[in-house]
Structure formats: structure tokens, C-alpha cells
Amino acid sequence: CIRDSIHAADEANMAAEYVDILQIPAFLSRQTDLLVAAAKTGKTVNIKKGQFLSPMAMQFAADKVIEAGNKNVMLTERGTTFGYQDLVVDYRGIPEMQSFGYPVVLDVTHSLQQPNQTSGVTGGMPQLIETIAKAGIAVGADGIFIETHENPAVAKSDGANMLKLDLLEGLLTKLVRIRQAIK
């Protein structure tokens, strides 16, 4: 399954030729023209919750996709602004968004971003990836998104909140066990 973000309505059709899921970035999650263009491709539309939105506000974004004729919607929790330089995950939002009838994914690594640091570069807390992922599965997230890299320190983007690739298999094994325990 291939997923990619689109940032403008005129990108939807071209991207749809190559991907299975069109993703709407968090900062664009209220852009009607973008949501409608993505919906009209017929592809699954994954809408990332803006850091500035409540989970309940995501119903309006999902409705725009549905009203455009596409019932293939996913929602992604990716943290909420907490002060000026931090994000937090409010796990209540996962079941709240699931109540709309769509799968909800937890974007673990972006939830651990620390934007607007004094150095001008976004920071992160990768040491909390396992904790946040486990909690997300425990509250019933339908999926987990984790950015990985062999060497996050040299990644071209988001390295400050990535999981080292060699740690992924062990983490996924733990998450599967948690999922099995709660079912």
C-alpha cells in the first residue's frame, strides 16, 4: 500500500495514478478544495488531524470527502499543540474519531515533534516512540505510523523524531502482542 501527501487540489489526480492512499497534511486538513479533489479520485483519503483542531472537528473534514462521493476515509491523530514548542497526544481523541465510523491511525513520530525550537529547527523526542505507540495500540488505534531511517541523524527530514530502522521489528512485535491482549 503506497501513501503520499498532496498539498494542492491540482496534485490529486496525478498522485492518484501512483498511490493507494492520498494523505491530507495536518495543516491543510480544513481545506475544502483539497479534500474534495482527493475524494473525487476515488482513492482512500487519509486526513491528518490539524494540531489546532479538536478530534470532534475532524467529522467536518470527513463529511467533505463523503459528500464528494467517496466513502473511503481514514483519520490520523498526530498530536495537539501544547504551548509554543511542543505537541501532546490526547488519547481520548482516538475513540472519539473512531465514533464517526472510520479507521483512526496514530502518527507516533510526528506526535513527538517539538516545533519552532530556538535553533530554528524542529526537534523531537524519539526516546518516547515506543511508549506513545504502545499507548496508542492499547486505546485501540486501528494503525500506527512511524517514520524510520537507518541513521536518523542524517535523514533529510524529520530525523529528530524518527525510529532507527533496526528497532522497528522489535517494536512491531510488542505492538502485535498488545493488540492480541486487548482483543
Question: Which residue stretches match the model-derived regions?
Answer:
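Flexible, active-site-adjacent loop/turn segments at secondary-structure boundaries
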Residues: 25-26, 87, 110, 154, ...
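Glycine-rich anion-binding loops of enzyme active sites
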Residues: 6-32, 38-39, 52
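C-terminal helical cap(s) of enzyme catalytic domains, especially alpha/beta-barrels
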Residues: 151-183
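Short, small-residue-biased leader/transition segments that mark boundaries at the very start
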Residues: 1-2
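Short Asp/Glu-rich motifs
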Residues: 14-15, 57, 116, 155-156
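Electropositive, surface-exposed helix/loop patches at the edges of structured domains
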Residues: 6-15, 64-65, 141-144, 148-152, ...
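Hydrophobic side chains in well-ordered alpha-helices
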Residues: 15, 61, 132, 168-171
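Catalytic alpha/beta core domains of metabolic enzymes, predominantly
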Residues: 30-148
